[in-house]
Curated annotation (Swiss-Prot):
Natural source organism: Alteromonas mediterranea (strain DSM 17117 / CIP 110805 / LMG 28347 / Deep ecotype)
Entries under PROSITE patterns matching the protein: RIBOSOMAL_S8
Function of the molecule: One of the primary rRNA binding proteins, it binds directly to 16S rRNA central domain where it helps coordinate assembly of the platform of the 30S subunit.
CC per GO annotation: ribonucleoprotein complex; ribosome
Gene that this sequence comes from: rpsH
Subunit text: Part of the 30S ribosomal subunit. Contacts proteins S5 and S12.
UniProt keywords, alphabetically: Ribonucleoprotein, Ribosomal protein, RNA-binding, rRNA-binding
Protein name, per record: Small ribosomal subunit protein uS8
Pfam family, one: Ribosomal_S8
UniProt record similarity statement: Belongs to the universal ribosomal protein uS8 family.
One Gene Ontology MF term: rRNA binding
GO term, biological process aspect, one: translation
């Protein structure tokens, strides 16, 4: 059976891995998943990630913990295949009053809501991380 929403699957694997105190989680790789991991790493939500494999690329995400507690409190999908959510630059949400980040897919690539606001761009709200 094919996967209906690969990004929601990615977020679920990360959430489940952290709740189970796993060191890392693996998943099928794609350009969008790698771009999301770059944002998560830059914001300090994951330790590292690595994509490997030619025939079936695999993405391994190394999870991050602070004093034994998971760093990611909530990670949720906003825009989904059945209901895409697009926002203009002025309408970009602030997650938890600016403490979390919204991951936004813009014409210049995947970035945080802060970076998109500074660049004066809107886009599709992929998800929230806090």
């Amino acid at each position: 059976m094919s996967m209906q929403d690969p990004i929601a699957d990615m977020f679920t694997r990360i959430r489940n891995g952290q709740m189970a105190q796993k060191v890392s989680v693996t998943m099928p790789s794609s350009k969008l998943r790698v771009a999301i991991c770059e944002v998560l790493k830059a914001e300090g939500y994951i330790t590292d990630f690595a994509a490997s494999g030619d025939v079936k690329p695999v993405l391994e995400v190394t999870l991050k913990y602070f004093e034994g507690k998971q760093v990611i409190d909530t990670i949720e999908r906003v825009s989904r295949p059945g209901l895409r959510i697009y926002k203009k630059k002025d309408e970009l949400p602030k997650v938890m009053g600016g403490l979390g980040v919204a991951i936004v897919s813009t014409s210049k690539g995947v970035m945080t809501d802060r970076a998109a606001r500074n660049a004066g761009m809107g886009g599709e709200i992929i998800g929230y991380v806090a």
